[in-house]
Design a protein with these regions (language model features):
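Selective recognition of specific alpha-helical transmembrane segments in multi-pass small-molecule
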Residues: 45-59, 86-96, 125-126, 146-158, ...
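A glycine-rich, acidic short-motif signal
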Residues: 370-437
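Hydrophobic alpha-helical segments and their helix-loop junctions in multi-pass secondary transporters
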Residues: 90-97, 101, 147-173, 188-191, ...
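Membrane helical hairpin/interfacial module
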Residues: 26-123, 429-437
């Protein structure tokens, strides 16, 4: 189905909305310093697409439940669930605004404060959601294909700039790491976690029960672009530079020119595509705030949208805080909470399974709360800084390594098992002898 009927969006419009909402945040924010880089992360990305494909089936079955949270979960449960998703709207919107505030002064307009950039961005997005879901569907129908084609063209133009030596260096430095693969896997799951809002949207899609292939196609398209960029960035910039840049795609855009020097600043065109996608994503979040508020019985949707816009602007003003804490929020709060909410509501909607839903949700909560966030390391296995001292005398050099007092550092009050000193001393006439010792 290509066109919408009865004020509902078509499958094609749904697919293009997914591209517009996810493409720029993914390309800008998933690579770089302390993010998903390297071969292990690439393996994790590919693995994450498999459970996401099955998750789409669950989301479609959850659509009737989320259309009226107050009815399916009860007044209290419905409102708490609605507030949980509203917090995600605020955090995600604040993060996108903070990214916009950093990109625009660097790439497009100088001398404009981040606060004013965020203000005008929110104002534009508030104006853009007045058409409701049909209006957003028409916007996606017109511009979604252009954005996707532009990003693919940009990647193709960057391929000739790649160097095989850079990829060989990355492959030579690669060591299999289960932890890094898991980080890439779970990081991709967290990035796609906004797909969990689809049940609020699918009620406005024509024949949503058959929209699974469309949503899956969107996930696979985005996943393919993600993995392609994970290879293209180190091939063009070098792996060492990628892991140091905050937004490594920005220097990549600088070299993506058409043959013949058609424009002096062709990177501005690519940046325009990315900024449009970020604004569309922000507008979608504001639109979803209205859908969630009305479905959860929180009050008037328009009022909540206005409140969400103000709070998003306030969160974006924190700048560094939201940029550093949003990933932690996704990994440790939103994704586990999303699974708990969906499992609980799905089983609660089946009256004969209500008791089972409470039990399973309780087990999940206990597993998350008592499991050490799935990444705890025993104090004895943690890495501690060593104190280094060098003494010079007529006999040569004396290098001393001082280890911390583990019982005092960890607060466990354990006695040392061997009772030996925790200082290692190495003597030599010069540093070469000490290194060989």
């Amino acid at each position: 189905m290509r066109f919408a009927e009865n004020n509902r969006i078509s499958h094609s419009q749904l697919y293009r909305q997914m591209i517009l909402e996810f493409l720029a945040p993914f390309i800008l924010c998933m690579y770089g310093a302390r993010k998903l880089n390297g071969i292990n992360a690439l393996i994790g990305m590919a693995m994450a697409l498999i459970p996401l494909g099955f998750y789409v089936i669950v989301l479609i079955r959850m659509t009737p439940v989320f259309e009226n949270l107050k009815k399916s979960g009860g007044v209290l449960v419905g409102q708490l669930t609605g507030l949980f998703f509203m917090v995600f709207i605020l955090m995600a919107g604040g993060y996108i605004l903070a990214v916009l505030g950093q990109l625009v002064p660097v790439s497009l307009i100088t001398g404009m404060s981040e606060e004013w950039i965020a203000f005008w961005a929110v104002l534009v997005c508030m104006t853009g959601i007045r058409g409701g879901m049909p209006g957003r569907g028409r916007m996606a129908q017109i511009s979604g294909g252009v954005l996707l084609g532009g990003m693919i063209l940009m990647m193709i133009l960057c391929i000739p700039q790649g160097k095989a030596e850079y990829l060989q260096d990355m492959a030579a430095a690669w060591k299999f790491s289960g932890q890094e693969i898991f980080d890439g896997f779970y990081g991709t799951i967290c990035a796609f976690s906004a797909v969990g809002l689809l049940p609020f949207l699918l009620g406005n899609v024509e024949k949503y029960a058959s929209a699974g292939k469309t949503v899956l196609a969107g996930i696979l398209t985005l996943g393919g672009i993600l993995m392609g960029m994970a290879v293209l960035l180190p091939a063009v910039l070098g792996y060492g530079r990628v892991v140091q840049e905050r937004y490594p795609v920005l220097p990549l855009l600088d070299g993506a020119d058409l043959p013949g020097n058609v424009l002096a600043r062709f990177d501005v065109l690519w940046m325009g595509f990315l900024l449009y996608s970020l604004l569309f994503a922000l507008g979608s979040l504001l639109h979803y705030s209205r859908q969630i508020a009305e479905g959860a019985g929180l009050g008037r949707g328009k009022m909540w949208t206005a409140v969400a816009a103000v709070l998003i602007w306030c969160i974006a003003r924190t700048g560094k805080w939201i940029l550093e804490s949003f990933g932690w929020y996704l990994g440790y709060i939103f994704v586990p909470g999303l699974l708990i909410c969906q499992i609980f509501l799905f089983l609660r909607s089946k009256k004969r399974h209500r008791k089972k839903g409470v039990i399973i949700s309780g087990v999940l909560i206990c597993s998350i709360m008592l499991g050490g966030c799935a990444g705890a390391v025993e104090p004895e296995k943690r890495m501690y800084a060593l104190a280094l001292g060098v003494d010079a005398s007529e006999d040569g050099l004396l290098v001393s390594y001082g280890m911390p007092d583990l019982p005092e550092s960890t607060g466990q009050g354990k006695e040392e098992e061997n009772g030996s000193t925790r200082v290692l001393a190495i003597r030599g006439e010069n540093f070469t002898q000490i290194e060989e010792a």
